[in-house]
Amino acid sequence: MTGLALNCEIAPQTKFDRKNYFYPDLPKGYQISQYDMPICKNGYLDIKLDNGDTKRIRITRIHMEEDTGKLVHVKGKTLVDYNRAGVPLMELVTEPDINSSEEAKKFCQELQLILRYLDVSAANMEKGQMRCEVNISLSKNEKLGTKVEIKNLNSFKSVERSIEYEIKRQTEALDNKQEIIQETR
């Protein structure tokens, strides 16, 4: 239902694979994922901006995979919460059409409304039922810059603030002729 609501092509066939990697929040050492053959692809969601314009955000893919554990940093120690490990999740990936924190926030808000309307998910960000990971890359020309990923944002405000901060950080670095390092924050 989500794929249809987001104007996606629905795959007639899909498969799940093991995605092997070591990370402390992945106790099995692999994750089950539809990454190679997503259930949905080539969709879009139109969002209404504050100035009244409508912008189309293209959706590359929607696929199912297992959630991982959660790293919790407390008093100089890192703990791992495995309560959500193995729980199925839907991952949605967009094309690089989002150009501002406002557009990202509007996209997430509209997606949340659709998921709730379809009764696919309560999509409560504060409960971890919907999380956002943003990739920010700035460039002085048409070529995409080096991306920095910010993971597990759990509110519209954190999406907005994280993007604004990262745009400012990368702008200052580029203005000072510093290299942007690809990283996850």
Regions found by a protein language model. Name each.
Residues M1-R185:
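Basic, nucleic-acid-interacting segments
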